[in-house]
Amino acid sequence: YINFEGFSNAISTVGEYISDDALVIIETTVPPGTTEKIAYPILFEKLQKRFPNIKEVLLAHSYERVMPGPDYYNSIKNFWRVFAGCNRESSLRCKDFLKTIINTEKYKMMELKKPSASETAKIMENSFRALNIAFIDEWSNFAKLIGINLFEVIDAIRVRPTHKNIMEPGLGVGG
């Protein structure tokens, strides 16, 4: 069960104050379908009360791929972005907005067909990273248990061209 109360309240508040031509971009990790099935209806309802002739809401999903630490801002500007709008105008406006922030000459943007695809991509990215961290963490525990140097083992594996990106042990998932 996912409690969307806080998220829904925030979207509702946004909907009470934005103009009918404002673009809303959800940049956080949310379950697939959240942008279209939760945020969109709330925004549409709030905007329709103030703008009865409104036909569609300008809403998109574009998640951040930031690296914490001293280079945080650089990781926003100089990194690839995925985005998707709830409708064509939302996608176009989102792309135009992101172009003002992202270094698109070096870091291309990827437009997906639906926000749920963008939301899924973010969760898959997070899951992929978490699984790899957990994987190497388990091997680290095993190496300690049997008394071997896991860094030496990893170096031996990395000679294979397809395995150069194997992670090294660290603090573990969430650490």
Each language-model region and where it sits:
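Structural/interface elements that position substrates and couple domains in central-metabolism enzymes
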Residues: Y1-G175
